[in-house]
């Protein structure tokens, strides 16, 4: 990267904010103040984790709301006990945190939140992997805290699958009580993001056109949608251009590194949080059928039936 005058890796450029980010941040903060379940949904690489990390930093600095975070990485196996433990660890003032069992656990947590004398927000990342029972229990936990004179908000961050799951008829108890926000990331601002990214990593007023041609920037901006996609393909283009001794990076180099399958059905659904296993379970199908659908080898009648079900469920077909 030094060949192009970049001093910082592209994935460490910092926080990029659009008007959409500002509005979303304002709306989520308002929802946190009111308490309850909040879902922030965006595709893989749209910047959910970065945005929520920034939100947590702001809340910590203001000291008006106590921030708690679940650090467990095994989301599919998470139960309510894991999330309650996170609250105990972040709210307790004891050096050696002891989490009681049975009903005493909930009673002590309710007292902890009340004694905290500030609203509490629990952040849960990768929440699309949480099962229905855990979500229902979270709702009941918030009601328990509220009944004890405290206020607890839970921010669930996940892929669009989370939003679609919350809208399913079987999730009515949770979905109707959840405020859902969609993170569109840098949609509509890809060119501005590329210019900002190169400037932030160069550490000076270097013009983006000294690194990439205008045509190369335009192609990246028109073909890619998320910060993660842009960072990855920009890295590939810079490496290819360095190897060929070309500077600035041309549109031909960018075209040579762009993934041809980036908008195929399988990667699109994966970015929205759907694995083959998820699709099999939700649409009463078989793994072989789903793979055949991805490969365009499934018979027309079954393809039409599956696509109709997926469209009704909110999948981007």
Language-model-derived ranges and their functions:
Residues 1-35, 316-317:
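A short, basic N-terminal segment
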Residues 4-8, 70, 74-97:
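Conserved NTP-binding/hydrolysis module of P-loop NTPases
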Residues 34-54:
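Walker A/P-loop nucleotide-binding motif
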Residues 37, 107-156, 164, 168-169:
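Conserved Walker B catalytic segment
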Residues 56, 162-177:
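Short regulatory helix/loop adjacent to the ATP-binding pocket of P-loop NTPases
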Residues 72-74, 178-190:
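Conserved AAA+ ATPase "SRH/arginine-finger" region at the nucleotide-binding site
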Residues 93-101, 186-215:
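Conserved C-terminal "switch" segment of AAA+ ATPases
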Residues 199, 203, 207-317:
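C-terminal alpha-helical "lid" subdomain
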């Amino acid at each position: 990267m030094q060949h192009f005058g970049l001093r910082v890796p592209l994935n460490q450029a910092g926080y990029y904010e659009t008007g959409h980010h500002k509005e979303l941040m304002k709306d989520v903060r308002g929802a946190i103040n009111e308490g309850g379940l909040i879902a922030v949904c965006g595709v893989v690489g749209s910047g959910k984790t970065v945005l929520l990390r920034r939100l947590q930093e702001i809340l910590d600095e203001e000291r008006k709301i106590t921030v708690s975070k679940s650090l467990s990485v095994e989301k599919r196996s998470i139960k309510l006990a894991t999330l309650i433990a996170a609250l105990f660890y972040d709210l307790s003032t004891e050096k050696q945190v002891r989490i009681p069992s049975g009903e005493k656990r909930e009673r002590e947590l309710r007292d902890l939140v009340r004694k905290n004398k500030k609203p509490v927000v629990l952040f849960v990342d990768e929440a699309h992997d949480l099962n229905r029972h855990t979500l229902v229990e979270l709702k009941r936990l918030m009601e328990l805290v509220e009944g004890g004179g405290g206020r607890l908000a839970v921010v669930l961050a996940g892929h669009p699958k989370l939003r679609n799951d919350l809208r399913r008829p079987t999730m009515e108890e949770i979905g109707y009580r959840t405020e859902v926000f969609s993170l569109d990331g840098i949609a509509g601002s890809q060119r501005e993001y590329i210019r900002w990214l190169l400037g932030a990593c160069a550490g000076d007023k270097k013009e983006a056109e000294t690194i990439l041609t205008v045509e190369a920037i335009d192609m990246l901006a028109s073909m890619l949608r998320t910060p993660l996609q842009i960072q990855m393909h920009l890295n590939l283009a810079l490496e290819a251009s360095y190897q060929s001794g070309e500077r600035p990076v041309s549109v031909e180099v960018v075209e040579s590194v762009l993934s041809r399958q980036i908008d195929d059905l399988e990667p699109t659904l994966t970015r929205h949080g759907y694995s083959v296993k998820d699709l099999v379970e939700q649409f009463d199908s078989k793994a072989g059928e789903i793979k055949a659908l991805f490969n365009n080898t499934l018979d027309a009648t079954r393809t039409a039936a599956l696509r109709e079900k997926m469209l009704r469920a909110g999948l981007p077909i």
